[in-house]
UniProtKB/Swiss-Prot annotation:
<dbReference type="GO" id="GO:0004719">
    <property type="term" value="F:protein-L-isoaspartate (D-aspartate) O-methyltransferase activity"/>
</dbReference>
<dbReference type="Pfam" id="PF01135">
    <property type="entry name" value="PCMT"/>
</dbReference>
<dbReference type="InterPro" id="IPR000682">
    <property type="entry name" value="PCMT"/>
</dbReference>
<dbReference type="GO" id="GO:0032259">
    <property type="term" value="P:methylation"/>
</dbReference>
<comment type="similarity">
    <text>Belongs to the methyltransferase superfamily. L-isoaspartyl/D-aspartyl protein methyltransferase family.</text>
</comment>
<dbReference type="GO" id="GO:0030091">
    <property type="term" value="P:protein repair"/>
</dbReference>
<feature type="region of interest" description="Disordered">
    <location>
        <begin position="1"/>
        <end position="39"/>
    </location>
</feature>
<comment type="function">
    <text>Catalyzes the methyl esterification of L-isoaspartyl residues in peptides and proteins that result from spontaneous decomposition of normal L-aspartyl and L-asparaginyl residues. It plays a role in the repair and/or degradation of damaged proteins.</text>
</comment>
<dbReference type="GO" id="GO:0005737">
    <property type="term" value="C:cytoplasm"/>
</dbReference>
<dbReference type="GO" id="GO:0036211">
    <property type="term" value="P:protein modification process"/>
</dbReference>
<feature type="compositionally biased region" description="Basic and acidic residues">
    <location>
        <begin position="25"/>
        <end position="39"/>
    </location>
</feature>
<feature type="active site">
    <location>
        <position position="98"/>
    </location>
</feature>
<dbReference type="InterPro" id="IPR029063">
    <property type="entry name" value="SAM-dependent_MTases_sf"/>
</dbReference>
<keyword id="KW-0489">Methyltransferase</keyword>
<protein>
    <recommendedName>
        <fullName>Protein-L-isoaspartate O-methyltransferase 1</fullName>
        <ecNumber>2.1.1.77</ecNumber>
    </recommendedName>
</protein>
<keyword id="KW-0808">Transferase</keyword>
<keyword id="KW-0963">Cytoplasm</keyword>
Length: 251
């Protein structure tokens, strides 16, 4: 004969279910609080990093753009804790994400502003493109070319997660530029070339600026300006260390 329940009595099974639910809710709440705390810590670390870079004279506009870009969303999970250290970080396939101070230097030299069309060679994780996306705004656009397919997917995922709709990641040989959307107001190369690739010079608008590391073991950052008549002017801006540009006009 089934056991009769008194009014208000709860079965053992129901009590256990309620207990499990309560425990799960507490666990979820604790996890949410931990995530919020981690996010707060990362934001504080980002602010400290940008302040340190600013001490060395980086442009205020560039610093503000970098402050808006969550670098921790552009590194592999294992490198997240080092996202706001001013150093390059490995992102796999023998590639790195540039040190933040170098991102600031290159963006300064590019003289980026609202509405410009930019070509980047070497998308990597998408971080540099995101910073440039902030600087050119919604009326501008950044096209970034990457030869390693898994990194193309990684960069696209990161940029989507961070909310950048004015950046397009392309799978191609970056040493040849991207003629379909040429000419460009600005071109930046985030890997070292043996010489300045002719297709990139051709795809740079008159009045445009290109930044490119040139060299093998000894590399120099070169700033190129194309005057309104199409004449090229080069200026060396100091020694750097970048991964090599691979492709038809690379190593």
């Amino acid at each position: 004969m089934p056991e009769r329940k008194e009014k208000g009595q709860v079965s053992v099974g129901a009590a256990e279910d309620r207990g499990k639910k309560g425990h799960s809710e507490k666990k979820d709440k604790r996890k949410q609080e931990e995530n919020q705390e981690e996010l707060h810590q990362l934001e504080e670390m980002r602010e400290r990093l940008i302040r340190r870079i600013g001490i060395h004279g980086a442009d205020e506009k560039v610093l503000k753009a970098m402050l808006r870009v969550p670098r921790h969303l552009f590194v592999p999970e294992y490198a997240k804790k080092g996202a706001y250290i001013d150093t390059p970080l490995e992102i796999g396939f023998g590639q790195t994400i540039s040190a933040p101070h170098m991102v600031a230097i290159m963006c300064d030299l590019l003289e980026l502003s609202e509405g410009l069309k930019v070509l980047e060679i070497g998308a990597g994780s998408g971080y540099n493109a995101a910073v440039m996306g902030e600087l050119v705004g919604k009326s501008g656009h950044v096209y970034t070319v990457e030869r390693i397919e898994p990194l193309v997917d990684f960069a696209r995922e990161n940029l989507k997660k961070a909310g950048y709709e004015n950046v397009t990641v392309l799978l191609d040989d970056g040493s040849m530029g991207y003629s379909k959307c040429a000419p460009y107001d600005r071109i930046v190369v985030t890997c070292a070339a043996p010489d300045i690739p002719e297709p990139l010079l051709e795809q740079l608008k008159p009045g445009g600026i290109m930044i490119i590391p040139v060299g093998d073991y000894i590399q120099e950052l070169v700033r190129i300006k194309k005057d309104p008549e199409g004449k090229i002017h080069e200026e060396k801006r100091g020694g750097v260390v970048f991964v090599p540009l691979i492709g038809k006009y690379g190593f």
